[in-house]
């Protein structure tokens, strides 16, 4: 009997290995992207949001003192949950996520509107999966030759400085988001998931994934956890919250 821990990609691989090895498994969702659709929350997400929020807090003072636009690039392979949540919590003026189309002109319009109110600095948070305005994916080539998501913050900065007199600085958090001490809520969630997973094994209920829904732990078929993907939806209450706070979130909101 095995407990497997990971995101949708890890679960797909481990489920296949378990089938080939004739192992009985129970899965626990752990991904900072929070994109496993069958659960409202995954282990690691709240910690990543907390790290990104602290980064925005730290960038606020230097942005104000030097009258700059500080751009923070955060993880989010396909979904913008980290950027959206941290952006609201950390007081970002602009939040860019892959689910909502943006334009450089839209960003400039927002910055100009702020200047009219004598606000000469700004905080921009962008998920790594956000594409260029022309729809091309931004990839960073590493020393091992692999190309991975990364660099959209630099692209946004370049475009803004090319078209305006705004001075930009870019910070990419990278794996700092994955290595921070877990928040209390993540520790509690992990404990609840672990206890429930062991109980499933005890009851010989296999090929199940534990999930968090309506403030309690439930279990669903592993295939459901793998198959369903959770993006930020336009009707998401946090999208409405961001818009009500006058945060720029794209041109079609």
Residue positions per predicted region:
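C-terminal non-catalytic interaction/assembly regions of soluble proteins
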Residues: 148-253
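Short beta-strand elements at the ligand-binding edges of bilobed clamshell
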Residues: 38-49, 181-187
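Conserved beta-strand scaffold positions in the cores of enzyme catalytic domains, especially
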Residues: 25-27, 71, 95, 168-170, ...
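Short, ordered loop/turn segments at secondary-structure junctions
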Residues: 7-10, 28-34, 76, 99-102, ...
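Accessory alpha-helical/coil subdomains and C-terminal extensions
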Residues: 4-6, 16, 21, 45-166
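Acidic/polar active-site rim loop that often engages polyanionic ligands
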Residues: 28-41, 64-65, 89-90
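Short, well-ordered, mixed-charge alpha-helical segments that flank or form enzyme active sites
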Residues: 11-14, 33-37, 78-82, 219
């Amino acid at each position: 009997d095995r407990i497997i821990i990971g995101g949708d990609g890890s679960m797909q691989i481990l489920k296949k290995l378990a089938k080939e090895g004739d192992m009985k498994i129970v899965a626990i969702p752990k991904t900072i992207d929070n994109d496993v659709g069958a659960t409202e929350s995954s282990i690691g997400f709240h910690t990543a949001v907390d790290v990104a929020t602290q980064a925005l807090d730290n960038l606020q003072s230097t942005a104000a003192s030097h009258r700059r636009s500080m751009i923070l690039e955060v993880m989010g392979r396909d979904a913008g949950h980290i950027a959206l949540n941290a952006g609201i919590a950390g007081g970002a003026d602009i939040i860019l996520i892959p689910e909502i189309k943006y334009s450089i002109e839209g960003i400039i319009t927002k910055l100009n509107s702020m200047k009219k109110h004598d606000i000469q600095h700004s905080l921009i948070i962008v998920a790594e999966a956000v594409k260029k305005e022309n729809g091309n994916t931004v990839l960073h080539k590493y020393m091992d030759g692999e190309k991975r998501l990364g660099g959209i913050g630099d692209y946004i900065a370049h475009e803004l400085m090319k078209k305006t007199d705004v001075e930009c600085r870019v910070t990419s958090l990278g794996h700092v988001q994955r290595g921070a001490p877990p928040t209390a809520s993540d520790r509690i969630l992990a404990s609840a998931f672990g206890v429930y997973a062991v109980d499933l094994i005890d009851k010989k209920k296999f090929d199940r994934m534990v999930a968090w829904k309506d403030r309690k732990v439930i279990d669903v078929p592993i295939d459901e956890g793998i198959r369903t993907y959770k993006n930020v939806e336009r009707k998401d209450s946090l999208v409405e919250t961001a818009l009500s706070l006058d945060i720029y979130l794209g041109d079609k909101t």
